[in-house]
Amino acid sequence: TATGYYTNNTPSGAMRTFGVLQPTFAIESLMDICSEKLGIDPIELRMINGMKDGAVTHTRQVLGKVAYTETLKKCSEIAGWEVGSSRVRGSVRKDIKGSQIAEPYIPGKEFKSEEAMKLCRDRFKYGRGVGTGWYGIGRCATIDKAGAFVEIDDGGTAMILTGVSEIGEGILTVLTQIAADELGMYPEDITIGDNDTARVPEAAHVGASRQTYMIGNAVCNACRDVKKKFIREMAAYWNIDSSSICMKNRRIYVEGNAQYNLSLKEAVDICKKIRGIVPLGSGTYTAHHDGLDPVDGRGNPWHWNLGSA
């Protein structure tokens, strides 16, 4: 049995990296309070204090590229946010400028009856606000790793095998796009196979926003491996230098030479039936960390980081 206690702590879990949402909510709330008291636009205050390239974290890690202010600036441009007093920001402003002009929202306008519109206006307030975040991705206590297999199949298509789990984050689409780009195919030519970890390489856990970075790189490396082998076999068949061969738009060819230009389907047939080779590739990706000092907490836990707005 278990006993649960109701407290004033925010419910938490592993959604968008462990332990980030809860303090971010508090920090962003305080940033708005500070901007109000100081009379500084909330976006301007965040631009002044936000993480920038070369920033040092609380663990003394020196960051490389940090996209926080860049992301916030782009978001403010799209939203048509004009710098000014935080007291006058909101959807009723007439002087909004930006790449996309936002029309003021009229509460209840979607309702047909006056009574429903009035009820909506009395209950809800509408305006605009800003929220930002920054965090590192992947495992920070241990080495993070992932692996993948790729096979170029009959018909000039490809099969990706990895232990990735799709729980709604869209990783299968991302891996399909990565593979298609690397192999010169279209997304519809890519199939993501069974993720039974007894038969496919480890992809590790779903969480900490790591899948695109870790598994995406593993798939990318696997595609480059099979592409190199595939081109090598076709170069031997054509008796030419492999460095001159390209794979793009479902074809394998030498630029400007019609003599060496085949569909991937035709090339796979040659590779299998004449060369006797099944085009297979494998790839791994590892993010190395030096861990954290158990005494003072210093270290470089993050291999990459994200900024959001």
Model feature map: region roles:
Residues T10-P23, A208:
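A short glycine-threonine-serine/GTX helix/turn-capping micro-motif
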Residues T1-Y5, A26-S29, E36-L38, E44-M159, ...:
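Cofactor-centric catalytic regions
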Residues L183-P187:
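Phosphate-handling active-site elements
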